Regions:
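Surface loops at the rim/top face of extracytoplasmic beta-rich domains
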Residues: 214-217, 223, 254, 259-286, ...
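Surface loop/turn signatures of beta-propeller and other carbohydrate-active proteins
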Residues: 24, 28-33, 37-63, 80-105, ...
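Loop/turn-rich, solvent-exposed surfaces of beta-rich toroidal or solenoidal domains
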Residues: 323-373, 407-420
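Non-cytosolic beta-sandwich-type ligand-binding/adhesion modules
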Residues: 21-86, 127, 172-175, 218-224, ...
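Entry beta-strands of beta-propeller and related beta-repeat scaffolds
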Residues: 106-111, 203-207, 255-259, 352-355, ...
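Short glycine/acidic-enriched loop and turn motifs that connect beta-strands
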Residues: 116-121, 212-215, 264-269, 360-364, ...
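Bacterial N-terminal signal peptides
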Residues: 7-16
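Positively charged n-region of N-terminal signal peptides that target proteins for export
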Residues: 1-4
Length: 504
């Protein structure tokens, strides 16, 4: 475990820092104006972070001309979200293809994928071995009041709907704890097997799929995920002017449905793992139709050459010959070589949006999960980082108080959230107007926490990292001290982005 500790003293009363009813440091200029002395810290890109194991920082002292009543100290960290830890394959052992996650509420988590039987693969020149005979037994599982049967897979059970025959598409599993999974049967059919995303709208699951593969998103509306039958097929939802799809859907707090979609108009996607430098963005009031395209969420195209070239897709004309007479598509050649992303998944934490997807770097290097962030889904997203190896086709969900990043590889990931521990704070007050601190609070660890928002699967409440000062004495000056300890085993570290001291 890394034990990097930073001691940071910030007197938030420097010149040009007082504005209205708060004192704020939140930009490069603010930090530079506020700092009186520092050792062992880097102040860059509007943040403060440790250069080594320890560091110190003091800001210029400035006193108020009258007593003020402090309410709280709030600390905000960088949104880069590198605080991920690997875990063994998440979800049912026999879930196949790209996993799709859906959080309905506390203790009500769903995972969708194709149903595999885990039949042993045959060695070359040999016949495949048969699965050992298995006799299901009646079972009970906390949180499930329906009849259950054991399965040949550990921590997995069949509900009545799970005994229905498959239809060649995706199946549904439900969990109360992200450890034990109950199979409820098929939710899509063979032609709709290219499921990319799911959302929760007014008590119904919206299950989105490409038809044909890598083309216009279609949608099922399922008001009963327990019956082992697909819901109502509403047909095409997004008429995509480009090729690519592999779309992720997210509903905003106003109820609008947003889609983030691959756009292959500037790349030979067949040579780049069917990914693209462009992520299109469209929005609909109902998630069923009427999607209007906006500016791209991600646009990392290089220079267009004006040359038009073609590539071939293996599925279009075969799967939907009525709408697609050919498998050949055009694209405009761009130079130099471009990064490519895709298989999008989205989540929003306290208004900060994140896009997770495939990351296929230039030069033929290994694929991984990459992610972007933006303070608004209507603004361009900026690159954060990457993790893992292999073609991920990821999805993300908030469950059991933490965040799960599922991939189609053997390794998945879990995170407590974008906040990186450990930050301990105390505040001092000058009550006598002599420029010296008369009283300090105790040292208190502060950190963000996260919670569900009723009725929303991918919108997560952020509770800020704050110190309550409402019972603190009034004063002419206030001083803040922070201790920051990097307690993670991953590459993340606490990066302080802003401090805000608020007053009555």
């Amino acid at each position: 475990m890394k034990q990097t500790t930073l001691f940071l003293t910030a007197t938030l009363l420097g010149q040009a820092l007082v504005s209205g009813e708060s004192v704020t440091v939140d930009s490069q200029a603010d930090w530079e104006k506020a700092i009186a002395s520092s050792t062992g810290v880097a102040v860059e890109n509007g943040t403060v972070s440790p250069m080594g194991k320890t560091g110190q920082l003091k800001t210029k002292l400035k006193r108020f001309d009258r007593k003020r009543s402090a309410l709280s100290l709030t600390i905000r960290q960088s949104a880069v979200w590198q605080n991920w830890n690997p875990i063994e394959n998440l979800g049912p052992a026999n879930l196949r293809d790209a996993p799709v996650l859906l959080t309905v509420g506390p203790g009500n988590y769903w995972m969708f994928g194709r149903y595999g039987n885990n039949k042993p693969k045959a060695k070359r020149g040999e016949q495949a071995k048969r699965l050992a005979k298995f006799t299901p037994q009646e079972a009970k599982l906390e949180g499930f009041d329906m009849p259950l049967q054991t399965t040949r897979f550990p921590n997995q059970y069949n509900a009545p709907g799970g005994l229905n025959p498959g239809k060649g598409g995706y199946h549904a599993w439900q969990s109360r704890d992200m450890k034990n999974w109950v199979h409820h049967g098929p939710v899509t059919e063979g032609f709709s097997r290219w499921v990319t995303s799911a959302e929760w709208v007014d008590g119904k699951a919206y299950i989105y799929y490409d038809f044909p593969n890598d083309q216009d998103p279609h949608v099922y509306v399922d008001d009963n995920l327990f019956d082992g039958l697909p819901g109502k097929n509403m047909g095409i939802a997004v008429e995509d002017p480009s090729h690519g799809s592999d779309a992720g859907f997210i509903r905003d707090l106003d109820g609008n449905m947003h889609v983030i979609i691959e756009d292959w108009g500037a790349i030979n996607a067949s040579k780049r793992s069917w990914d693209s430098p462009v992520a299109g963005h469209a929005v609909s009031p109902n998630g069923l139709n009427g999607f209007k395209f906006q500016k791209p969420a991600v646009d990392n195209r290089t220079k267009p050459t004006g040359k038009i070239a073609t590539y071939r897709h293996p599925h279009w004309a075969k799967e939907d010959p009525k709408r697609f007479k050919t498998n050949i598509a055009e694209y405009e050649v761009h130079e130099p070589e471009q990064e490519a992303y895709g298989d999008w998944a989205a989540i929003c934490i306290g208004g900060q949006y994140y896009l997770f997807g495939d990351y296929d770097p230039i030069g033929g290097h290994k694929m991984s999960v990459g992610w972007f962030t933006s303070p608004s889904i209507d603004q361009p997203f900026t690159w954060c980082d990457k993790i893992g190896n292999g073609h991920p086709d990821p999805d993300i969900a908030f469950a059991e108080g933490q965040f799960y990043l599922a991939t189609q590889q053997q390794t998945d990931y879990v995170s407590p959230g974008p906040w990186v521990e450990k930050v301990t704070a105390r505040v001092g007050v000058d009550t006598s107007n002599d420029g010296k601190i008369d009283l300090w609070t105790n040292w208190i660890e502060v950190k963000e926490s996260y919670d569900y928002i009723k009725g929303f699967s991918k919108q997560v409440k952020r509770v800020p990292a704050a110190l309550d000062l409402s019972k603190f004495p009034d004063g002419y000056a206030f001083q803040v001290e922070l201790k920051i300890a990097d307690s993670t085993d991953n590459k993340s570290k606490p990066i302080i982005e802003s401090l805000e001291l608020t007053f009555e």
